């Protein structure tokens, strides 16, 4: 089973991750992580922090001569901005100059609950770990599982279907057509857009909305469509609640900072439709093989993959740090106050797509390993190939 831990503060020296359970023999290079770290930093509406950092993973263990060796893989990503925060974020030495505490929580952030939960007299420690900067370490860690899946012929991609009121009003047939070539083809086309949209008119609207929000000191959220192609039938299980693949995918997606909603396929539209309008009918092709007319279920039925493209929809709320602050209060004086302002993005929905692609990779890799096993990637691949050949 693949599992990972991340460590590090937003303005500390480094972000660190340890990934355990990766089969031996997987070809792995730092660029397999760095390409997605760079993608995470892109997107119209990002803040000044992304102009400072150029995230690159330094792999420290678990790889020899370019191949995984079955032991835990560790890596570090240096925070360049640490040089500007050594006084405020020093691990051991008392600050050389007084450091002001942060006492006013931001509505919508972890500030309020985190300060009370951990008994801090300063919100700064909460901000440092709850920050979405942590997702750089997660994208790096999950990129290893992503490479494992890629080498098994399984591809992950995404695009943005909504930013604020700039949203798709009908199914994107262009996306469906691209997916015939694999989810990574979709990913590359989306990456050509500053907001990772496939519709140029919508892209223009979204960028104008981001400009408007930035001028107003406001923020924007949106919706990301995530797809996975090449999955075999039968990953997950209906036998027990905790083996249903959709539950694990939901947990991974909802662990992303600012993500508040998740659906598989057209779940919410399906919920208000007749069953005859929802379920994906079968037909037999000219070779007598069963096919589907539609994919409204999003590639999952009964907690298992059904051979269709996996389709997840991810709802990201607007970022909680507003340059035109909302109403709050001061913990020290217990009097009304404008909420704290922290350097932030106006819109991070494009980055959310990259993060969502990443966090589902270990879930899918573990589903593969649960079904097919293998201490080496060659063992896993052989068993997967035998299984898929039998299904043809």
Swiss-Prot record:
GO terms for cellular component: cytosol. It catalyses: 5-O-(1-carboxyvinyl)-3-phosphoshikimate = chorismate + phosphate. NADP(+) binds at residues 40, 46. GO terms for biological process: amino acid biosynthetic process; aromatic amino acid family biosynthetic process; chorismate biosynthetic process. Keywords: Amino-acid biosynthesis, Aromatic amino acid biosynthesis, FAD, Flavoprotein, FMN, Lyase, NADP. InterPro entries: Chorismate_synth, Chorismate_synth_AroC_sf, Chorismate_synthase_CS. Pfam families: Chorismate_synt. Its cofactor is FMNH2. The keyword RNA-binding does not apply. Its EC number is 4.2.3.5. The keyword DNA damage does not apply. Reduced FMN (FMNH(2)). FMN binds at residues 129-131, 257-258, 302, 317-321, 343. PROSITE patterns: CHORISMATE_SYNTHASE_1. Pathway: Metabolic intermediate biosynthesis; chorismate biosynthesis; chorismate from D-erythrose 4-phosphate and phosphoenolpyruvate: step 7/7. GO terms for molecular function: chorismate synthase activity; FMN binding. Belongs to the chorismate synthase family. This reaction introduces a second double bond into the aromatic ring system. Homotetramer. This is Chorismate synthase. It comes from Chloroherpeton thalassium (strain ATCC 35110 / GB-78).
């Amino acid at each position: 089973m693949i599992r990972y831990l991340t460590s590090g503060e937003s303005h500390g020296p480094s972000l660190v991750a340890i990934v355990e359970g990766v089969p031996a023999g997987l070809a792995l290079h730092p660029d397999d992580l760095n390409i997605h770290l760079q993608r995470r930093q892109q997107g119209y509406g990002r803040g000044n922090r992304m102009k400072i950092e150029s995230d690159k993973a330094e792999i420290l263990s678990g790889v020899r001569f370019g191949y995984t060796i079955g032991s835990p893989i560790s890596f570090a990503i240096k925070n360049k901005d640490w040089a500007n925060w050594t006084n405020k974020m020093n691990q051991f030495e008392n600050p050389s100059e007084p450091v002001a505490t942060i006492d006013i929580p931001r509505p919508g952030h972890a500030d309020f609950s985190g300060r009370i939960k951990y008994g801090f007299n300063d919100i700064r420690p909460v901000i440092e770990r709850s920050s979405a900067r942590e997702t750089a370490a997660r994208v790096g860690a999950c990129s290893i599982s992503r490479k494992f899946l890629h080498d098994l012929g399984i591809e992950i991609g995404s695009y943005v279907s909504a930013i604020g009121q700039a949203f798709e009003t009908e199914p994107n047939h262009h996306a469906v057509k691209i997916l015939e070539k694999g989810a990574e083809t979709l990913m590359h086309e989306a990456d050509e857009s500053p907001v990772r949209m496939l519709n140029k008119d919508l892209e223009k609207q979204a960028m104008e909305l981001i400009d408007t929000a930035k001028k107003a000191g406001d923020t924007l959220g949106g919706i990301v469509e995530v797809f996975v192609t090449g999955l075999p039938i039968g990953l997950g299980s209906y036998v027990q609640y905790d083996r249903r693949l959709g539950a694990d995918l939901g947990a991974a997606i909802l662990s992303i900072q600012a993500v508040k909603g998740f659906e598989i396929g057209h779940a919410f539209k399906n919920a208000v439709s007749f069953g005859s309008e929802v379920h994906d009918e079968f037909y037999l092709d000219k070779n007598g093989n069963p096919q589907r007319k539609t994919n409204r279920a999003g590639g999952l039925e009964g907690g298992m993959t059904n051979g269709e493209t996996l389709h997840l929809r991810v709802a990201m709320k607007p970022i909680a740090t507003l340059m035109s602050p909302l109403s709050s209060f001061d913990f020290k004086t217990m009097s009304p106050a404008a909420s704290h302002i922290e350097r932030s993005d106006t819109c991070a929905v494009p980055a959310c797509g990259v993060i969502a692609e990443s966090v589902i990779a270990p879930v899918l890799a573990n589903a593969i390993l649960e079904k097919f096993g293998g201490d080496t990637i060659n063992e896993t691949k052989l068993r997967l190939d035998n299984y898929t050949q039998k299904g043809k």
